[in-house]
Swiss-Prot record:
This is ATP synthase subunit beta. Keywords: ATP synthesis, ATP-binding, Cell inner membrane, Cell membrane, CF(1), Hydrogen ion transport, Ion transport, Membrane, Nucleotide-binding, Translocase, Transport. It is a peripheral membrane protein. ATP binds at residues 163-170. GO terms for molecular function: ATP binding; ATP hydrolysis activity; proton-transporting ATP synthase activity, rotational mechanism. Gene3D superfamilies: 2.40.10.170, Bovine Mitochondrial F1-atpase, Atp Synthase Beta Chain, Chain D, domain 3 (1.10.1140.10), P-loop containing nucleotide triphosphate hydrolases (3.40.50.300). PANTHER family: ATP SYNTHASE, ATP SYNTHASE SUBUNIT BETA, MITOCHONDRIAL. F-type ATPases have 2 components, CF(1) - the catalytic core - and CF(0) - the membrane proton channel. CF(1) has five subunits: alpha(3), beta(3), gamma(1), delta(1), epsilon(1). CF(0) has three main subunits: a(1), b(2) and c(9-12). The alpha and beta chains form an alternating ring which encloses part of the gamma chain. CF(1) is attached to CF(0) by a central stalk formed by the gamma and epsilon chains, while a peripheral stalk is formed by the delta and b chains. The lineage of its organism: Bacteria, Pseudomonadati, Aquificota, Aquificia, Aquificales.
Length: 478
């Protein structure tokens, strides 16, 4: 058995810990793990002990390394013993982790007892070689009309949910988790990066109630935790997802909420390590940090990892370096706007701003492509006419333009949909709409066949049959 290398703490500055390894031939490598025992006082005034993991970030000379703590550092003292792990922090993987909640170091935090995992994989792993990656394109049905029709997702793809605060990113993610688990029986990995602890708890309780928890593993590094935790928790989740892809041959979904907080934590870590900031105060290694996470998300010949990442846009400025660096890696962008949220259209996805490089005839087929393009054309024309309507009113439009406006309003409302995870708020049962039903329903709306139905009949329904039924309930002639 290899000798355990030990050092001692010489300095603690917030989440940064300097450790001295005297008389060792080789210092721990960058990104390798260290551990120590933290002694602190809990809320009730009782002393407790827990293992604190750290990650080596710099070699600072004189046999010293600078490490980033993966947890609170209160209770650490100078001279305290630190143990070198011999490599990166290792994470439990396998079916044993399903239904559980973990922290960044792979320790269970749901008070459900220890995890009897048969295998432990390092937190950092290289992305698959190019020869191992799959070139097959397979569309993933989400059951959400606006996504399936206008920005299709592929297995092994990367999707960004862009939006400011409070426009519905987390709810949309919860619905996608629900639909994948319930209708596809796929495994999901949920990574909470720097988001609200309350939301993490709510999501766990909702998944427990809806029965999808056995198909899911959760890894949390929430906003109350040190930057090292928020900066590395995405890698922990990816290691777990990679096991399901590479060993079990599964198509896995990884949900990262919020990838911007990962960048933000990287900026904090960078500042703590004394690096000079780059544009807008972000870390100089911004693109490298983002690339390390994104390159691990891909399809191989064995299985796939599809990533759906919520991206907070600071001050709704899409040109900010953080969202911009994430943009470069995405196959599809789903943009949520406050304008639609204010109109009560949920999901508040902008059908014109949102894109997918797989919305092309060779991937989705001619019929799907033509219906999607016609929907976009009508909505684009409606957007152009809105300025004229605001100044001159509807009366000044030609008959053709009036028909386009009326149809566009119905399409806009028809792109809304009641969610299963929001039933308790809306009082409306959630709808999962199959892709063929979505295409057929919009194709019929585009013909003008249902222009006579009231606009509100199209609001918060599933298929066109649901809209007809709602119109009947409203007393309209069908």
């Amino acid at each position: 058995m290899a000798e355990v290398i030990k050092g001692r703490i010489v300095q603690v500055i917030g989440p940064v810990v300097d450790v001295e390894f005297e008389g060792v031939k080789e210092l721990p490598r960058i990104k390798d793990g260290l551990k120590t025992i933290r002694r602190a006082i809990d809320d009730r005034g009782n002393w407790f002990e827990e293992v604190l993991f750290m990650e080596v970030a710099q070699h600072i000379g004189e046999h010293r390394v600078r490490a980033i703590a993966m947890g609170p550092t209160d209770g650490l003292v100078r001279g305290q013993e630190v143990e070198y792990l011999g490599g990166p922090i290792k994470i439990p993987v396998g079916k044993e982790v399903l239904g559980r909640i973990f922290n960044v170091a792979g320790q269970p935090i749901d008070e459900q007892g220890p995890v009897e995992a048969k295998e432990y994989w390092p937190m950092f792993r290289n992305p698959p070689e190019l020869v191992e990656q799959s070139t097959k394109v397979e569309i993933l049905e989400t059951g959400i009309k606006v996504i399936d029709l206008l920005q299709p997702i592929i297995k092994g793809g990367k999707v960004g949910l862009f939006g400011g605060a409070g426009v519905g990113k987390t709810v949309l993610m919860q619905e996608l988790i629900h639909n994948i688990a319930r209708f596809h029986e796929g495994y999901s990995v949920v990574v909470g990066v720097g988001e609200r602890t309350r939301e993490g708890n709510d999501l766990w309780l909702e998944m427990k109630e809806s029965g999808v928890l056995p198909y899911t593993v959760m890894v949390y590094g929430q906003m109350n935790e040190p930057p090292g935790v928020r900066f590395r928790v995405a890698h922990t989740g990816l290691t777990m997802a990679e096991y399901f892809r590479d060993v079990e041959g599964q198509d896995v979904l990884i949900f990262i909420d919020n990838i911007f907080r990962f960048v933000q934590a990287g900026s904090e870590v960078s500042t703590l390590l004394g690096r000079l900031p780059s544009a807008v105060g972000y870390q100089p290694t911004l693109n490298t940090d983002v690339g390390e996470v994104q390159e691990r998300i891909t399809s191989t010949k064995k299985g796939s990892i599809t990533a759906i990442q919520a991206v907070y846009v600071p001050a709704d400025d899409i040109t900010d370096p953080a969202p911009w660096s994430i943009f470069a890696h995405l196959d599809a962008t789903t943009v949520l706007t406050r304008r639609l949220a204010e109109l009560g259209i949920y999901p508040a996805i902008d059908p014109l701003e949102s894109t997918s490089k797989y919305l092309a005839p060779e991937y989705v087929g001619e019929e799907h492509y033509e219906v999607a393009m016609e929907v976009k054309r009508i909505l684009q024309r409606y957007k152009e006419l809105q300025e004229i309507i605001a100044i001159l009113g509807m009366e000044e439009l030609s008959e053709e333009d009036k028909a386009i406006v009326n149809r566009a309003r119905r399409i806009q409302k028809f792109l809304s949909q009641p969610f299963h995870v929001a039933e308790q708020f809306t009082g409306m049962p959630g709808k999962y709409v199959k892709l063929e039903d979505t295409i057929r329903s919009f194709k019929e709306v585009l013909t003008g066949k249902y222009d006579h139905l009231p606009e509100n009949a199209f609001y918060m329904v599933g298929t066109i049959e649901d809209a007809i039924e709602k119109a009947k309930q409203m007393g309209a002639k069908v």
